[in-house]
């Protein structure tokens, strides 16, 4: 079965370098749910083995689903992982449509860590028109904007507010930043869960 891989690095808000140095270490955890008792989420991870993460009482769950270019509409808040083109535009590798409650997350234009020279643009869709090589989208953010070409082979994903009831055994989940506490335990306030064939990373 075809699986859609959802990458999330650099889609979240950046933290100032000085403040980051003072923060406790974090761990990225991705895998399948083994169990969830309402507080402790047990995950089987290929990279980390069996991991248990304590979820905070207000932990948010976001469902990640496959979307289409038709969902990329003016006003939508998106994140675009792309490669720069010779004409100054960005050719999208992956587009993420954020839930409305996530509007403003990671806003701006910066390097992406998915592959060498790749970029990340988070902002609001200002306009979208059909182009020769794909849909041409203007993404506006505070202080600037980027012209993005979304080719037919770009991965397009959508985030929606989910519920802890989705954290069932076998569900594919990803925690981008699980806080590693002094006693070695992990704690998180957000979980991404794949819907359909999407596998969050």
Q: Can you annotate each of these PLM segments?
A:
Residues 6-16:
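Bacterial N-terminal signal peptides
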Residues 4, 17-201:
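Short, flexible, surface-exposed loop segments at domain boundaries
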């Amino acid at each position: 079965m075809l699986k859609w891989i959802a990458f999330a690095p650099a889609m979240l808000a950046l933290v100032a370098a000085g403040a980051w140095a003072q923060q406790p270490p974090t761990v990225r955890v991705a895998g399948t749910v083994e169990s969830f008792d309402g507080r402790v989420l047990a995950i089987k991870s290929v990279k980390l083995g069996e991991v248990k993460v304590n979820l905070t009482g207000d932990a948010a769950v976001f469902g990640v689903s496959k979307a289409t270019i038709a969902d990329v509409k003016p006003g939508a808040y998106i994140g675009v992982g792309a490669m720069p083109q010779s004409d100054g535009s960005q050719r999208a590798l992956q587009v993420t449509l954020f839930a409305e409650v996530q509007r403003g997350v990671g806003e701006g234009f910066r390097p992406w860590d998915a592959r060498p020279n790749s970029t990340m643009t988070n902002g609001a869709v200002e306009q979208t028109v059909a182009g020769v090589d794909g849909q041409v989208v203007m993404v506006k953010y505070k202080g600037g904007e980027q012209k993005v070409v979304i080719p037919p082979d770009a991965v397009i994903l959508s985030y929606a507010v989910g519920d802890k009831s989705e954290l069932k055994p076998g569900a594919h989940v990803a925690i981008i930043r699980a806080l590693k506490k002094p006693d070695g335990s992990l704690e998180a306030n957000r979980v991404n869960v794949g819907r359909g064939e999407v596998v969050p990373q």
